Structure formats: structure tokens, C-alpha cells
């Protein structure tokens, strides 16, 4: 009975900010990946340098992801959808996506990020299904190569 109306709305706002993570296939992502509202986040470590990457993707290695998470949020401030991947999207990609969700929920500020997704089968699945692979050395990749 001691709860104020303010605490009711504050609690409701916190619950509304909780984000979920969904999956997207390479076939679903291909026609969308160059849209200006989408950012592809590659969390592979060194293998990005020799295996190639999805054109236009941003690289935030999983090993240093926590240290650079605020930079990532700043870098994608004009995006509403983030798609995470690693080699297979079984460990590093989902882990980093969850870390971002936790970070955003802790910060409780509206970043504009509405959708956090994981690329099914990761980069290896993307490449194996014949999707375009960029092998440029540009950091960040401008996406001109595929």
C-alpha cells in the first residue's frame, strides 16, 4: 500500500525496456543487410582478418567486447536493428548480443535499438550458402567490396 503512482510507472518503464534476442537466416538478411537502419556486428576475433567478412559489418572482437560496448552503442546510434554473428553463432555471437541487452537494460536510456538478432549459422553459414564475402582490409569496412 505504500507504493506511489510514480513507482508503478517507473517499474512499468523498466519492464518495457527489456529486450529480447531473435534469430535471422542468411537468406532473410541478404536483402536487408545494406539498409541504413541495420548494423551487422562481427564478434569474431582474428579469423575476420583472413576469412573475410560481411560487407559493411562492424568489427567488435568478442575478447574485448565488454571494454568497447559503449563505443558500439555510440557507433550505432542511428540504427534500430543489430545483427550479431561469429563463425557459427553458437557461443560468441549470442554471448555478445546478451551482453549488449544487459548493458542497455542497465543504462535504461532509449538508444533507438529495437531489434537485436543473431545470424543463424554465423559467418561460416553465410559464406557456405554462397552469400557475398568481402575481403577488404578497411577498418571499418565501407561495404564497397560486395
Curated annotation (Swiss-Prot):
Query: Which GO biological process annotations does it have?
Result: cell division; protein phosphorylation; response to arsenic-containing substance
Anything else the record notes?
Answer: Binds 1 zinc ion which is not required for enzyme activity. Plants silencing ACR2 show increased sensitivity to arsenate but not arsenite.
Question: What broad class describes the main subcellular location of this protein?
Answer: nucleus
List the effects observed when the gene is inactivated.
No visible phenotype under normal growth conditions, but plants show reduced root size when grown in presence of hydroxyurea. No visible phenotype, but decreased accumulation of total arsenic in shoots. No effect on arsenate sensitivity. No effect on the accumulation of arsenate in roots, efflux of arsenite or uptake of arsenate, or the total arsenic accumulation in shoots.
Its biological function? Tyrosine protein phosphatase that dephosphorylates CDK complex and activate its kinase activity in vitro.
The question of whether Zinc is a record keyword is answered with: yes
Give the disulfide map.
Answer: none
Q: Look up keyword Chloroplast and say if it applies.
A: no
Q: Which gene encodes it?
A: CDC25
Instruction: Tell me what this protein is called.
Output: Dual specificity phosphatase Cdc25
State the organism of origin: Arabidopsis thaliana
Q: Tell me which UniProt keywords the record has, alphabetically.
A: Cell cycle, Cell division, Hydrolase, Metal-binding, Mitosis, Nucleus, Oxidoreductase, Protein phosphatase, Zinc
Notes on how activity is controlled: Inhibited by NSC95397.
InterPro entries reported in the protein's UniProt record: Rhodanese-like_dom, Rhodanese-like_dom_sf
Residues annotated for substrate binding in this entry: 45-48, 68-71, 90-92
Amino acid at each position: 500500500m505504500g507504493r506511489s503512482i510514480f513507482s508503478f510507472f517507473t517499474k512499468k518503464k523498466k519492464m518495457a525496456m527489456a529486450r529480447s534476442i531473435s534469430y535471422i537466416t542468411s537468406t532473410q538478411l541478404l536483402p536487408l543487410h545494406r539498409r541504413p537502419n541495420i548494423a551487422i556486428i562481427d564478434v569474431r576475433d582474428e579469423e575476420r582478418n583472413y576469412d573475410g567478412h560481411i560487407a559493411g559489418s562492424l568489427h567488435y572482437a568478442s575478447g574485448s567486447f565488454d571494454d568497447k560496448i559503449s563505443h558500439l552503442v555510440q557507433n550505432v546510434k542511428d540504427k534500430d536493428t543489430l545483427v550479431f554473428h561469429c563463425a557459427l553463432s553458437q557461443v560468441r555471437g549470442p554471448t555478445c548480443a546478451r551482453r549488449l541487452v544487459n548493458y542497455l537494460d542497465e543504462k535504461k536510456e532509449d538508444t533507438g535499438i529495437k531489434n537485436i538478432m543473431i545470424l543463424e549459422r554465423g559467418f561460416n553459414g553465410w559464406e557456405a550458402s554462397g552469400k557475398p564475402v568481402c575481403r577488404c582490409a578497411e577498418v571499418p569496412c565501407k561495404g564497397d567490396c560486395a
